[in-house]
């Protein structure tokens, strides 16, 4: 029995604002159902002696050292801004 229905696929497509045909919905339903079936096989593995991990590699937080540097002068930054006022860059309103 399928775990993913065509209606599920159409619903998710609608939520994602994607227009899909009935043929595409059926194709995606089969593909998604195969993926879910494969993922469920992982539940059958015995992981009793396996430590929980959050990453497959042993390296964590490999980052370079932070080195503070002098920033650009305000005048230099404002030269590249299309519009500015009182040392601040003006941008078009995003929210009304």
UniProtKB/Swiss-Prot annotation:
Signal peptide: none
Presence of keyword ATP-binding: yes
InterPro entries named among the record's database cross-references: Asp/Glu-ADT_sf_sub_c, GatC
One Pfam family hit: GatC
GO MF entries: asparaginyl-tRNA synthase (glutamine-hydrolyzing) activity; ATP binding; glutaminyl-tRNA synthase (glutamine-hydrolyzing) activity
UniProt keywords, alphabetically: ATP-binding, Ligase, Nucleotide-binding, Protein biosynthesis
Gene3D superfamilies with a match to the protein in the record: Glu-tRNAGln amidotransferase C subunit, N-terminal domain
Any Gene Ontology biological process: glutaminyl-tRNAGln biosynthesis via transamidation
Catalysis performed (reactions): L-glutamyl-tRNA(Gln) + L-glutamine + ATP + H2O = L-glutaminyl-tRNA(Gln) + L-glutamate + ADP + phosphate + H(+); L-aspartyl-tRNA(Asn) + L-glutamine + ATP + H2O = L-asparaginyl-tRNA(Asn) + L-glutamate + ADP + phosphate + 2 H(+)
The EC number(s) this enzyme carries: 6.3.5.-
Complexes and interactors: Heterotrimer of A, B and C subunits.
Function summary: Allows the formation of correctly charged Asn-tRNA(Asn) or Gln-tRNA(Gln) through the transamidation of misacylated Asp-tRNA(Asn) or Glu-tRNA(Gln) in organisms which lack either or both of asparaginyl-tRNA or glutaminyl-tRNA synthetases. The reaction takes place in the presence of glutamine and ATP through an activated phospho-Asp-tRNA(Asn) or phospho-Glu-tRNA(Gln).
Listed NCBIfam families: gatC
UniProt similarity note: Belongs to the GatC family.
Entry protein name: Aspartyl/glutamyl-tRNA(Asn/Gln) amidotransferase subunit C
Organismal lineage: Bacteria, Bacillati, Bacillota, Bacilli, Bacillales
